[in-house]
Amino acid sequence: MQLVLAAKYIGAAIATIGLIGADDKTSNM
Protein backbone atom coordinates (compact mmCIF):
# COMPACT_ATOMS: atom_id res chain seq x y z
CA MET A 1 0.00 0.00 0.00
CA GLN A 2 2.70 2.49 0.99
CA LEU A 3 4.79 1.50 -2.03
CA VAL A 4 1.97 2.46 -4.39
CA LEU A 5 1.47 5.82 -2.69
CA ALA A 6 5.21 6.45 -2.58
CA ALA A 7 5.62 5.50 -6.24
CA LYS A 8 2.76 7.80 -7.27
CA TYR A 9 4.08 10.67 -5.14
CA ILE A 10 7.66 10.23 -6.38
CA GLY A 11 6.42 9.94 -9.96
CA ALA A 12 4.54 13.23 -9.67
CA ALA A 13 7.53 14.91 -8.03
CA ILE A 14 9.90 13.67 -10.75
CA ALA A 15 7.48 14.80 -13.47
CA THR A 16 7.16 18.24 -11.87
CA ILE A 17 10.92 18.60 -11.41
CA GLY A 18 11.49 17.41 -14.97
CA LEU A 19 9.04 19.97 -16.34
CA ILE A 20 10.31 22.84 -14.19
CA GLY A 21 14.06 22.19 -14.29
CA ALA A 22 14.30 20.77 -17.80
CA ASP A 23 16.71 23.49 -18.90
CA ASP A 24 18.64 23.64 -15.63
CA LYS A 25 19.19 19.91 -15.20
CA THR A 26 19.61 18.33 -18.61
CA SER A 27 21.84 15.56 -17.21
CA ASN A 28 19.30 14.25 -14.71
CA MET A 29 19.44 10.67 -15.98
UniProtKB/Swiss-Prot annotation:
- List this protein's GO terms for biological process: proton transmembrane transport
Protein keywords: CF(0), Hydrogen ion transport, Ion transport, Lipid-binding, Membrane, Mitochondrion, Transmembrane, Transport
Q: Which residues form the signal peptide?
A: none
Under Gene Ontology molecular function, one entry of this record is:
lipid binding
Q: Does the keyword Nucleotide-binding apply?
A: no
User: Cellular component per GO?
Assistant: mitochondrial membrane; proton-transporting ATP synthase complex
Q: Subcellular localization, per the record? A: Mitochondrion membrane
Primary location: mitochondrion
Keyword check for Membrane: yes
The similarity annotation says: Belongs to the ATPase C chain family.
The record describes its quaternary structure and partners as: F-type ATPases have 2 components, CF(1) - the catalytic core - and CF(0) - the membrane proton channel. CF(1) has five subunits: alpha(3), beta(3), gamma(1), delta(1), epsilon(1). CF(0) has three main subunits: a, b and c.
Per the entry, what this protein does is: Mitochondrial membrane ATP synthase (F(1)F(0) ATP synthase or Complex V) produces ATP from ADP in the presence of a proton gradient across the membrane which is generated by electron transport complexes of the respiratory chain. F-type ATPases consist of two structural domains, F(1) - containing the extramembraneous catalytic core and F(0) - containing the membrane proton channel, linked together by a central stalk and a peripheral stalk. During catalysis, ATP synthesis in the catalytic domain of F(1) is coupled via a rotary mechanism of the central stalk subunits to proton translocation.
Put simply, this protein is called ATP synthase subunit 9, mitochondrial
